[in-house]
Each structure stands twice: as structure tokens, then as C-alpha cells.
A protein has these predicted regions:
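C-terminal motif of bacterial Sec signal peptides marking the signal peptidase cleavage site
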Residues: 15-19
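Bacterial N-terminal signal peptides that target proteins for export
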Residues: 1-8
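Helix-rich interaction surfaces within compact, conserved domain-sized segments
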Residues: 103, 108-160
Length: 160
């Protein structure tokens, strides 16, 4: 009987170790500090600085771009304006997404921008107001979850 419990405990330990080390395509969404310059509405980016790249808050245009699919990289002023309006941006490195561009574009709508960004260190990044998720591979489930969790939530995080 004692051998049985030892075997069960070893099996549980092995399963726990396997589950804890399993690789996921996206990291856990992380909140970034609200930039002190987030209340600045600018008409040009001269002298503007953002705390991260791609940004999750900071100076921005007074009017946000429309949601949808873009074939160019949005400026940081455009990105932050869209995030402040409650939108989510999914950016991808055009040389690192393999055959997933069609799937990525399915995420786009009035509240979600999908845009290339060749300066990314990793294949896909999702941003929302003060939130970011990084993905080493395209992961529909993780990105849809991020969009669901953060689209429309900018105001709740704006004054923290």
C-alpha cells in the first residue's frame, strides 16, 4: 500500500512539473504604469517620449484613428489615441507570423486595430490602455481573451 502512495505522489509531482513548465505562446497580460504625459493631446510628436514600445499610454492625438486593418505601422500618437478611446491594437512583425496574417486580420473590428510593426522584437503584441500581452507565436485564444478583457476598459484605468 505504501508503494502505491509513493507512486501516486511521484506521478502527481511529475504532472505538476510538466504543467508548470509547459510553454505557452503568449505571456500573461501585464499592466504598465500610467504615463505622466497621458493627458497631453499633441498635434505632432516633436519632443514626445513614451515609456514603452509599443506604448500603452502617454501623449497622443486628440482624435483616435478608426479600428480595422492597416497595412502600415501607426505612429505612437495614433496608437495611444486609439488605446485611450478603449480600443485594442494587435501588432505583428511582418516577417515573423508565417501563414497567420489571415487569422490575425479576423481579429480586427471597430474596436480592434491589426497593424504590422517591423520594429517588434517578437512576432505579435497586443496593447490596450496600460496593458500589454506579448506572443512568441500567433495564439487566437490568448489574443481574443485579451481583447475581451480590455476592449472598452480605458476609462477605468485612466486615472489610476
Amino acid at each position: 500500500m505504501r508503494k502505491f502512495f509513493v507512486c501516486v505522489n511521484l506521478l502527481l509531482l511529475l504532472l505538476t512539473q510538466t504543467a508548470c513548465t509547459a510553454e505557452s505562446d503568449c505571456d500573461i497580460p501585464r499592466q504598465e504604469p500610467l504615463s505622466a504625459s497621458s493627458s497631453f493631446h499633441l498635434l505632432e510628436s516633436v519632443g514626445a517620449v513614451w515609456d514603452s514600445s509599443p506604448p500603452t499610454s502617454g501623449p497622443h492625438y486628440p482624435i483616435a484613428p478608426a479600428g480595422g486593418i492597416y497595412d502600415f505601422t501607426l505612429s505612437s500618437l495614433e496608437q495611444v489615441a486609439f488605446l485611450e478611446s478603449g480600443g485594442v491594437i494587435v501588432q505583428y512583425h511582418p516577417n515573423r507570423i508565417e501563414n497567420n496574417l489571415g487569422k490575425l486580420t479576423l481579429l480586427a473590428n471597430n474596436n480592434v486595430i491589426v497593424s504590422p510593426n517591423p520594429t517588434l522584437d517578437i512576432p505579435v503584441i497586443g496593447t490596450a490602455w496600460t496593458w500589454k500581452i506579448s506572443c512568441k507565436n500567433f495564439d487566437t485564444t490568448a489574443l481574443r481573451g485579451f481583447i475581451t478583457d480590455y476592449v472598452g476598459k480605458a476609462e477605468a484605468n485612466h486615472r489610476k
